[in-house]
């Protein structure tokens, strides 16, 4: 009899193989976090001994933690994968940043528009993503195989039934799919799977003394000199880690002593808050994640 994690693994591998068989030009969105690391491990397993029959795509906002970028490049080189990095040229030309323009504009330009540009440029018709239903309410109601319009928009009213684990990957010309193989996993499942298979992850997930400032109720790490300090702010060293990773000025750390996977698992069993409480972009407005997804966001 399969264990809980083995059932989740089998489901995810089935989804990947099914979509690859029914699409012409698939891609895996690689955001460098723990979910992407698990999804990549599953992809390596699904198509072994061959490499995954699709490239990795990272939509780079230029504001990721430095350790994330180093981990991205090391992972692609170690596994010999086709990594494609897209940076929105409009964001570069207009100097978009989360401080001057705000998190909503920053996210739209760098992430949403950047992703749509990359998908159009390469002609990808199916994109694997690492979103999970337990993360956030709009992700909870989105299907595993999610249809997107020619403009990459998501319409919740056009979702298809997925009875008996049957996935409809049909689409009209110009439409595309967003596919979420680990949709049914929980944060605890992810960490247990990482420990079971010794999957490499970004060191930022482990507690360490790091320079942070307390801003609007969040602990923001001072990752480089671009972070403007407000009046009275002085970076202080605190033992923190991150439950979720994104652009460093928009990602809050948590106080933690978890320096190992065992420590993190124990912390997960005791926590009563969502991992996305540290993502400042989720607080832009009521229902902001669903609005972003309707506009083409991950």
Swiss-Prot record:
GO MF terms, alphabetically ordered: ATP binding; sulfate adenylyltransferase (ATP) activity
Protein task: With CysN forms the ATP sulfurylase (ATPS) that catalyzes the adenylation of sulfate producing adenosine 5'-phosphosulfate (APS) and diphosphate, the first enzymatic step in sulfur assimilation pathway. APS synthesis involves the formation of a high-energy phosphoric-sulfuric acid anhydride bond driven by GTP hydrolysis by CysN coupled to ATP hydrolysis by CysD.
Entry keywords, A to Z: ATP-binding, Nucleotide-binding, Nucleotidyltransferase, Transferase
Record's subunit section: Heterodimer composed of CysD, the smaller subunit, and CysN.
Name listed for the protein in its UniProt record: Sulfate adenylyltransferase subunit 2
Entries under InterPro entries matching the protein: PAPS_reduct_dom, Rossmann-like_a/b/a_fold, SO4_adenylTrfase_ssu, Sulfate_adenylyltrnsfr_sub2
Origin: domain of life: Bacteria
UniProt enzyme class: transferase
Family annotation (Gene3D superfamilies): HUPs (3.40.50.620)
Basic and acidic residues composition-biased segments: 272-282, 289-298
Region spans: Disordered: 272-298
Catalytic activity: sulfate + ATP + H(+) = adenosine 5'-phosphosulfate + diphosphate
Example GO BP: sulfate assimilation
Biochemical pathway: Sulfur metabolism; hydrogen sulfide biosynthesis; sulfite from sulfate: step 1/3
Similarity field: Belongs to the PAPS reductase family. CysD subfamily.
EC number(s) reported in the record: 2.7.7.4
Phylogenetic classification of the source organism: Bacteria, Pseudomonadati, Pseudomonadota, Betaproteobacteria, Burkholderiales
